[in-house]
Design a protein with these regions (language model features):
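Local beta-strand N-terminus motif with an aromatic residue
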Residues: 2-3, 172
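Dinucleotide-binding Rossmann-like beta1-alpha1 core, especially the glycine-rich loop
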Residues: 39, 43-129
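A conserved active-site cap/scaffold subdomain adjacent to cofactor or substrate pockets
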Residues: 270-333
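Long, low-complexity C-terminal extensions of enzymes
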Residues: 321-411
């Protein structure tokens, strides 16, 4: 007997759900409510390597969606200023995905000039977008809004209703809430215990023009006085944003700092800055009754380490797996809590391990006991099941912060 699903919200999470559902749940009737008047979030998204499999699972070729979405290859993450605000004393660090590859040293690039200034995309992948025989040793920088449109174009069975709804439409077996931070139809808003206080809750974002002298093939995250700043290079622009704590700095002061940083770097803005705010939270039970929250509807803590789109991807794939296997919603909620915990712990490490004390934000972000608990958590579970971030990524993070002694066995 065919079942029906109603997706409310035509955002990235909404269309990703529709596209994946068409491919993997062929017996279901699919309807999406896509209100054209509601703007999409995002200024440029950094992704995890798992996204490659995601596109392949929907039958969308890399050489198709990357060209349409102005995406570029991402080879890791560049961190700067997380240990000290003094550029003379700071030692910037690059974490690379190919540390997780068995043949890492056979694939090492000559030097930094290979991945700085967009040269890898130009030398290897610029024309063909061809990656034969490659493993998950790269990810992507994408325009999330463009990926939603690309998936929408591939959908053939999804009924589209261009309307904004205020109540759940009648007659569907399952509802997917993709309404973002508004979370209009989430039935159980009990927050998951984060076990710590997360301060960053706001962001100024503004795309800037590309610049071959400044653009990178890695996601650049630079710690600032009251949070951190990201740079995500696309083919047609660069996404920039300042993620900060509104408890420690005013919105106006944060904007001034953000614009000043852009000016000092020689960046030329496209349009006016936009401000976003949120309450760092994750819902304990994203699937309650017959409504499932997907994407930022299910939770949002911090855009650090490319977790935003991954959590959307995980929420959709785990939901399909749960239904196909005949599991109960409790199983889905339990799995999603674990996935969120993994991501949050890794994000937390950046603040807990930082040695910065130049502002109250960095002082408040520290908690020595939590730092020890974090490493205990890592030791306990890293060998028990697969993490979002593999051991190699944790080791690179420990190298940057010089914190291996926290989890090394004491003789």
């Amino acid at each position: 007997m065919a079942k029906s699903i109603c997706i409310i919200g035509g955002s990235t999470s909404g269309w990703w759900t529709a596209g994946y559902w068409e491919k993997h749940m062929p017996d279901w009737d699919i309807t999406i409510y896509d209100a054209p008047t509601i703007p999409a979030l995002g200024v440029g998204e950094s992704c995890l390597p798992q996204l490659k499999w995601w596109w392949e699972s929907m039958g969308i070729e890399e050489n198709q969606w990357m060209k349409k979405g102005n995406a570029v290859y991402k080879y890791g993450n560049y961190k700067e200023g997380w240990n000290t605000p003094d550029p003379e004393k700071d030692d910037p660090f690059v974490t690379r995905f190919w540390f997780n590859d068995d043949n890492i040293f056979d694939k090492m690039y000559a030097d930094k000039s290979n991945w700085k200034n967009g040269s890898i995309n130009k030398q290897i992948f610029y024309d063909e977008f061809d990656t034969p025989d490659k493993r998950a040793d790269y990810a992507y920088h994408v325009c999330a809004e463009s990926t939603a449109f690309i998936v929408k174009q591939t959908c053939q069975r999804t009924k589209v209703i261009e309307d904004e709804v205020t109540t759940l439409p009648n007659g569907y077996d399952l509802y997917i809430d993709c309404t973002g931070f508004s979370r209009k139809f989430v039935k159980d808003k009990t927050p998951m215990k984060l076990h710590y206080q997360h301060f960053v809750d706001s962001a100024w974002v503004n795309p800037v023009h590309t610049n071959e002298e400044l653009d990178w093939d890695v996601t650049k995250s630079t710690a600032r006085k009251y949070g951190w700043e990201f740079e995500i290079s696309l083919r047609n622009r660069v996404g920039m944003g300042y993620v900060y704590s509104s408890r420690h700095v005013s919105d106006e002061h944060a904007l001034d700092e953000f614009l000043n940083n852009q000016k000092q770097q020689g960046r030329v803005a496209i349009g006016e800055p936009r401000r976003y705010s949120w309450t760092p939270t994750v819902f304990q039970n994203p699937w309650s009754d017959n409504v499932v929250a997907i994407g930022s509807s299910a939770g949002f803590v911090d855009p650090l380490e490319a977790t935003t789109l991954f959590m959307t991807q995980a929420g959709i794939t785990q939901l399909v797996n749960t239904i196909k296997r005949g599991y109960r919603k409790e199983s889905y909620n339990r799995v999603m809590r674990r996935i969120w915990n993994d991501g949050i712990r890794f994000i937390l490490a950046h603040y807990q391990l930082s040695k910065r004390t130049d502002t109250q934000f960095w002082i408040d972000s520290k908690n020595v006991e939590m730092k020890k608990n974090m490493w205990d958590y890592y030791q306990k579970y890293t060998s028990s099941y697969q993490w979002i971030f593999p051991s190699g990524t944790w080791c690179q993070l420990g190298t940057y912060f010089n914190e291996f002694d926290f989890y090394a066995p004491k003789l």
